[in-house]
C-alpha cells in the first residue's frame, strides 16, 4: 500500500510534479472549508465538501477521514487513499468537471501523509485498520447504545460503515478476523435504524427522544405501520434477474408508504420524507382537544378530516368531468388503512412531481389512475392465483419518476423553449396553465394508463435541434399545439374584455349625463321630462354596440385556443357575437321609428322600416334586451342560489348556465354571503354616487354652454392650411376640449376610491382599536390592565374556567406571573438585539420573585421617581392625620405599590443579611412598630418624616456597596458601617421612641454594658450577595430609590418603543382565543434564498468608499443608541468574550441591521423560543409559579425532562425551511463570495439546530456510458461541524429552467415543509419574539366554525417597514408601503373582499394550496408577479383571503432612487403581464359587478389610471397645440360670446396631475393619524411636502405609466434585481440618463416643447396668468420628470462630482459598441438594448409605434405657417418647402459624414475644401433668406421647435422599421441621428445641474433635503460631510471602546461633499 502511494502516477501516466501541486493544494484549501474553525496553518484537513459532483460518493469517505484524523492519522490516510482509488475507478480519464484538479490535489496530499503518518495499534496497515475498527466499535457503538442520541449514533454508524468499506480494500477477505466480521454484520443490520433524520427518529433504537414518547406520535406511527392484509409485492417476470438487494426489498415493508413505494417505484428519499410528513399531520390533527389518558390510536374522524382536505379538489375534478371517483371503500375493508393508503399515495405523487406540482389537475389524473391500481391490487383478486390482473412490483425506485413525471416534464421543457427567454409572444407557447387545463376536459383520458407517449399531449413537433453548431436552447420551427381555453394576447383591449361591465357603466353614465346637461335647465331632474328621457333611452343602443365589441373581442382573441375548446364553447362565442350583432342592428332601427320628426340617418332608417312598425316597438325591444340583466340582478341579490347553480354539475343546470357563464373548472361560485355583499355594495354605491355627482357638476355641466357656443360658431381665419375649411360645428375644437375631460372622467374613480378607502379604512381601524396605545405615556397609563389582557388573549383558559368578558382593574397574581415570563423574555430579546441598554432592561423587567412582597411588583419604569416624590410629600406634609397622607399617596396608582414594595424589600434585605438573633429581633420590633402605628393611625405621631431623606441617602449608599465587587478587602466593613448608620438613623432620627427598642434588646440579650451598642449589627451573612434572585431584589430596590423622571423616556430607542406599544395595543384588539400548544395548528415557514447577503464579512464592514466611509462607521452614526448598547454588552466583564467572539458579534450586529438572511433566520427562530415558553406556562398552569423562565434548579432531571418535552412539542408544531437554491454550487465554488455565503449558511444551521436548508443539487453522473447532469432536491441540517443530508429526491431535470426563479425555488422546497399552515417569508424580512407569541392565535383563524362553513385560505398579516430612517426617499417609501400593508389591505379584505396575496408574510392553508397548484404561479414572464397569482388562484378555486393587524412582521424596502425605480418598474411590468393573464380575465368576468370594480381599481386598474393621468396631459397639450397653431383658439377666445363666459378657461384647467399625488398621500395621513395621532400625521405630511415628496411621487407616476404601457404594447418584462444595500449612493449622470432617458426625459422634453409652443403662439391673445393657471401642474410634472433623479441623488449638485459625471457621460457617448461591449460602457450598446422590445414585438406593436410617432409631425406642420418668412401664406406649398429644406439639411449632413469616412484620410485637403464650400454656401443661403425673403432670428428658433420633433419622428419610425432601414442602407444614419439627439437631450438636462452646482449652498440644501429624517434620528451627517473617521484606529479595536470614542476629525479643509457608501 505504501509503495503504491509513494510511487503513484497521475491519471495521465506521468509522475506528479511536486511544486505545482503544493501550490494548488494550498490554493484549494484556502478556497474554502467546511470547518467553522479557520486554522492559520498551511496544512489543513482535506475539504470533503469540495468534491466534484461526479465524484459525490467519495465525500462521505473523506468526511470520515477528517473525523478520525486526530484519533488515528494512519487510518485516516487509508480512508483518503481508498477515496482516491474509488475516484480513479469512477472517472479514470478525469473527464468530469474539476476531477483532474481534485485528484491531483488528493494525490499530493496522500504523498505527504505517506511519509509522516505512523502506525499506532499495529505494525501493518491491515492489522492497524482492523484493530482500530474493533476499538471504534467497542468504545463508541457498543458502549453508546441507549446512551447517545440518535443523531450521534447515526454518525457513528456512518463512520463504521465507511471504515469497513475501506477495511475490505486494505485487508484481503480471507484475513478479516471473526470479531471484525461479527461487528460489521451488526453494523450492517442496525445502520438503517440510525440514519440521519429530520424531526422524528422513527427507527432509532436505544435512547428514546422526547418527541417519540409523545402519545400522538406513537398513535400516528401505529396507524401508518398498519400493513395487515397488504399483499406482498410480486415482481414482473422481466425482473427475474434482480440482484439479492432488490429481492430483499420486495420481501419486507414496515409501513404503508414503503408498500406503495414497492408497488409503484417511489424513491427512498421521497418515501422517508412523506412518511414523516404524514405521521406529523396525523399526530397534530388527532391530538387536538383530546384527553391524553389511554391515548393509543388515531380517531377515525382524524383520518376522515384529512381525507376531506386532501381530496376535496380531486372529488371536485371527478364531478366536473362526470367520472367516478376512485376513492372506493369496499364493504368489510379496513377503512382507516385504506384511507391512509390513498393519502400516502397522493403525498408520494406530490412529493416526487417536481415542476408538475404546479399542475394540480394533472396530479389528480395521475392519482386517479394509481388509486384505481391500488384498489385493483387489494380487491381485484380475493383469492390470488397465478397470472394476476395487476402486476404488483415496480422494477426500481425511480420507476414512477421515469415513467410518469419525466415525460410530462419534457413536454413542459419543450414548450418553455418556445418562449425564447421571454421574447416570444405568449400565444406561441403553452405555459403551466395551458398544460394543466388540458386535464379539465374529459379528453385527457385519451392519455390512458399507463400513459400512451404517442398521445397528442406528448407529441411535440418542435424537437430540440440536432445541428451541432446550434445552441441547445434553440428549437426548430414547426406546427405548434393550440393554447388551452385562453390566449394571452398582447393588447390594451384586454382591459375592456376583462372589465367590460365597468366600461359600459362608465360610458352609459357619461352619455346620460351629457344628454341631461344638454337640456337648457341643466338640472339633473330634467331626466324626467319626456324628450330628455326619450334621448336617455339611446344608452341601450350604445350598450348594444359595446356588447358587440365585447363579443368580437372574445371571438378574435380566443381564436388561438379554438382547437382545444369544446364545440359548445365555440358555438357560445359565435352565438354571442351573432346576438350582439342582431341587437346592434335592431335597436337603432326600432329607435328610429320612435323619434318624432326624424332627420338625417334616423329619417333614413325610419323610411326604410316603413309604417308597419309601431312607435313603442323600441320600448319592447329595450324590455327584451335588458331581461338578462334583470335576471342577473336577481341572482346578484341571491348569492347562495347563484353559488349553487354555478357549482352544480347537473346537465340541466349546465345548459341553463351555458349562456350566462361558460362552464369552467375554476371560478365557480365565488359569491359572498349576504352581509358581506351588502357592505361592499354600500361602499361602491356611495362612491359611484359621489363620483357621478362630481363629474356632472364639475366636469361636464360647465363645458356644455361653451360647447354649444363653439358648435354654432363659424371660423374662417385659419392660420395654417386647413384641409376641411368648410367643415361645420368645429368638431376638432370640441374634441380638443372634451378629450382631457373624458379621460379624467374615466380615471377619477381611482381618486374617489382613494378617498373612500381612506375613510372606510380609518373608521374600521378605529373600531379595531388600532393606535389606542401609541406612546409611552399611554402605555404607562394602561399597563395595569396589560397582564390581564395578555392572559385573556394570549394564554389558553385553564380547564373549567370561563372566559373573561371584561378586563377589570383588579390584578391577579397568577396573571402577573404568566405575563412576567413572557414580558421578561421580550425585554431580554430586545437587550440581545441591542435595542435597550442594561439599565433600561432592569427598568423594564417585571421581577421574578413576586411572592416576597404583599403587593404587585410592577416594572421599575412605571415606578420611576415615585419613592423620591413620596419622600418629599411626607417630609413636607403639614397635616396631622395619617389618613390624609396615605390618601395622598394612594391617589397615585403606582406610588402606593412603590412605597409598600420598597418598605418590605428593605426589611427583607436587612433581615436576610443579619446572623445574630438579637439583631434580627431589633429589626422585627422596628417593623412591628411601623405596622401597628399604620393600623392604629398614629404613624405621623410615632415617626418623624424629616429624617426620611437622610435614611433614603444611606439606603442608596448601602445598596450600591452590596452590588459592588465582592473581592474588595473592606467590603464587609463598609456594609457593617452603613448598616449601623441606617439603624441609627431609624431609631434616633425617624422613630420618636426608637431608643426604647434598643434598650429592650439590651435587656433581652442579658447584656447591659453601655459599649455593647457599638457591637450590634456586626454579624452579617455575605453568602446572600452571590444569590442571583437576591441581587435582583437589591438592584430593583436601588432603581426604585434612585431613578428620577428620566425613566419616563425609557426606552430611548424608537424601535423598542414602537414594539412595546404595538404589542400592548394588540392585546386589546379582536383576536381568536389562544389554544393550548398541543391543540394549535402546526405550521412551517419557508424562505426562498438565491445569492443575497447572509452575514457581512469583516472585510465588507471595514471597506472604505472614496470618502473614507465604511458600513460599520455609517451604522454607528445612524444607530448611535444601539451601537452604545452593543459596546456595553460585548465589553461586559461577566461575559468574558474573546477578541474572536467580539469580531463575530460585530459581524452579527451589522448584519442584523441590514437586509440579510441571518436577520431573517434569527427572527423566524423566535417562533421556537415562543413555543417553548408557552409549553412552560402550560406546564406550570396548575401550580402557577412566581419564578422565572425555568423551573427550580434543585431538580436537574425535571428541568431536562421539561426542556426535552418543550423541544419535542416545538418540533411537532414548527418547521423552518430556507430554500437556498444554489447552496450546492456555492459549496463547491472557488469564488470568495460564494464560499462566504456557504460558510455563513452552514453556521446558521449549526447555530439553530432546527433550521433546515433545502437546495437543488447538480451532479454529473454516467448514464449509458455518457456523462450527464442529474438534479436532486436535497434537505440538510447542521450536525457537529458539517451539514448532514436528510433527504435526497431525484428530479426529472433542472427545475428552475421551466418557470420564474423564485416560485420554482419555493416549489422544490415545499415538499420538506410540514404542518397545516405555511408562512411565506422573504429574504428581506424580520420577526419579533413578542409577535411570535401570537402565532397560535392567528392560526386559529383557519379553525372551522369561526366563519360559518367557509374558512379563509390565506391569512394576510401587516408589516412594519424597518428601512424608513435612512433617507427621505426611504421614509417616503416606508410610509407608502406601510399605508398599503395596513389601511390598503384592511379595506381590500373588509368590506371589499378582494384582498389577494401581495408577497409576505401571509400564512397559507397549506393543504388547500398544495392540492391546488402551490403557493405561487411560475409560468415565465406572464407570472412575473408570482405572489399575487397565488391570491388569484386561491380565490378562483373557492378560497378567500383575510387581513389581520394584531400581529406584524418586519420588512425591508429599497432606499435609493434608482433601486426604488427598479422596484416600481418591476411591479408595473408585472401588472402589465397580469392584464394579459387568464386569471385577471376570469376574475373580472366572474366577480359580481361591485367586487369586479374593487378588483380592477386595486390591481391593474391603478396602473391603467396612472397611464391615463399621463395620457390626459398629452391629450390636453396636443389639443392646445392644435388650437393655437390652427388659430382656432385665438378666434374662439376673442369671440364676444365666449369671452364673456369664463367657463372655457375653467374647463382647460381641469387637470389631474396632482390628484394622483393626493391619492398617494391620503391613505398615509390617515394611517399615521390612526397609529401615531393626527397631529403627528399633519406634521409628517408637512415635512414630506417640504422634502419634495410630491416630486418623488409624480416621478414614480411616470415610471408606472411607462413600464405598464410598454409591457402591454411590446412585452419585454423581466425580473429586475433592485439590490438591498444599506444606504443610497451617488449615481453618475450617465447611469441616471440610461435609466430614465426613455421613461422620463424624452417625455419630459416633449412636454416642454408643447408648453413652450403653447405659450409662444398664444401670447398675443392670452394673459400669462391664464397660461400659468392652466399649465402650472404640467410644468410641475415636467420638472419632476426631468430633475427628480438629480434632486434625490446624493451629491447631485456637488461641483467636482458634476465635472466627473460630465466626463464620464462624454466618454460613454463617444464609445463605439459591438459584441461584448456592455451597455454601461458604450452608448451604442445601450441604444441597441433599449430597442430590444421593438425587435421582438408583433406587427400590431410596430404599427402602433409608428402611428404614435406621427404626432411629432404636427409641430412642423403648424409652426412653418407662423414663420415671418411664410408671410401668412396658408397654401400646402409652404409645408412642402419645409420638408425640402429639412431633407436638404439631412442630405448635406449625410454627405459630410460619408466624405469624412471616404476622403478624410487619403484626400484630406480635398475634404477640407469641400467643407469650406459647404460652409460658404450655407452663409450665402442664409444671407439671401435674411435679406431677400425676410427671415428673422425668431424664425430660426421657431424652425428648431418645428424640425427637432420631426427628426425625432423619423428616428422613431426608423427604429420601428429597423429591418427595412437596414436593407436600404440607412441604419447607420439613423444611429448617428439618434446619437445627435442624445447629445442634445443630455446637454439640455445637464446644463441646469451644472449651473446649480456652482453654488455650494445648493449642495448643502440638497443634503438637508435628502437626510432630514435621518437628522431627526440622530444621524450626524454634518460630521460625515465634514471629514473622515480616525484612520489610526483599526475597526477591530472599535470593540473595546464606547460610543464616545468614535469621533471624527474636524478639519476645515476636508470634504464639503458626501455620499453614503453601499
Swiss-Prot record:
The membrane-spanning stretches of this chain are 505-525, 536-556, 570-590, 621-641, 674-694, 731-751, 1497-1517, 1548-1568, 1577-1597, 1641-1661, 1668-1688, 1743-1763, 1772-1792, 1813-1833, 1836-1856, 1879-1899
Q: Which residues does the entry place in the Extracellular compartment? A: 526-535, 591-620, 695-730, 1518-1547, 1598-1640, 1689-1742, 1793-1812, 1857-1878
Annotated region (Disordered), positions in chain: 1-29
Q: Return the protein name.
A: Callose synthase 7
Give this protein's Gene Ontology molecular function annotations.
Answer: 1,3-beta-D-glucan synthase activity
Localization in the cell: Cell membrane
Q: Which UniProt keywords apply?
A: Cell membrane, Cell shape, Cell wall biogenesis/degradation, Glycosyltransferase, Membrane, Transferase, Transmembrane, Transmembrane helix
Task: Pull the Cytoplasmic topological domain ranges from the record.
Answer: 1-504, 557-569, 642-673, 752-1496, 1569-1576, 1662-1667, 1764-1771, 1834-1835, 1900-1958
Tell me a GO biological process for this protein: regulation of cell shape
Tell me the name of the encoding gene. CALS7
Q: Which organism is it from?
A: Arabidopsis thaliana
Membrane topology type = Multi-pass membrane protein
Q: Which residues form the signal peptide?
A: none
Q: Which family does it belong to?
A: Belongs to the glycosyltransferase 48 family.
